[in-house]
């Protein structure tokens, strides 16, 4: 029986088990008795060749797991058996059936998908570092190519099974369909895991690439931070920063009148202050070499600050002296008054709190007396009117007293 469905795009419109020059009906499903007449019959070698050409797996089936695995090779066919016809003595062959081809290819694909799933599991467990992610991406691409080849083999096997099911018994096709569905579901699960791992690796690669580019940018910036011809700041150096010559010697830390290179300098006193009378250093004298202009500016700044400090100190001293002078001026008069008065009399300053306490005590007594005198001044006539009346209920019996 001929299968009308093609295996895949590579085989074109050629039927499944009919290569060019192969017979259409004979030597496919079962054995036929060859008559004793002079008709041509195929030899065992030709039958085996035709069986492999017609029922062997197509080009899609050749992309299985690489290595020494048996699944990588096309299924091996058993040697066709022959027997002698008692009537004519001619030999007839038993070529392998399409169901056996389908089972062999299904086993091969199952082993291939198991190997791909194991490789995918190893890739999933080996993530976590940039170098591992890079190598994992390369391995994932190779795994994806192998998985696509296996998927094409599964598609070709499903098409072959559908064509075989149209010419087989319903019971045999039910078991075959269940096997093929399980194989397709396993292929789809591997594809889903592959896509998830690919998305994870892409995200890892993006993150690690950004981190690496950031590290490289920082390294380049760190290399470019070394002082160039324009100094540390380069062409953007601000004009207010001191130069290297200004930083060689600090006039404020001058000890013993030494200059920038250990030169002895002389100090000249300036004009005395009008308030404090002290003379501050007006400027630096001339030593072996003249001082720099920045040094004279620093001296002027120091002299101005010193003058302000002396002026503030003089103002504080003057403010402190004024109340002390007032106390000193008032103390002789107080002593004279105390001497003129009676030595046994108390001090008038001590009498003020006593009079205040006495006034408070008298006010308290007045309030207490008013509290006791106000209720008694009203009289007995007014007392009854001020007492509040309590409400009461009067019961009157219309028909007499109630029965006892």
UniProtKB/Swiss-Prot annotation:
Cell compartments where the protein resides: Nucleus outer membrane
Q: What residue spans carry the Basic residues bias annotation?
A: 307-320
Ranges of the Cytoplasmic topological domain: 1-355
Q: Identify the GO cellular component terms for this protein.
A: meiotic nuclear membrane microtubule tethering complex; nuclear outer membrane
Entry comment on modification after translation: The disulfid bond with SUN1 or SUN2 is required for stability of the respective LINC complex under tensile forces.
* Residue ranges crossing the lipid bilayer per the database entry: 356-376
What protein am I looking at?
Nesprin-4
In the UniProt record, what gene is named as encoding this protein? SYNE4
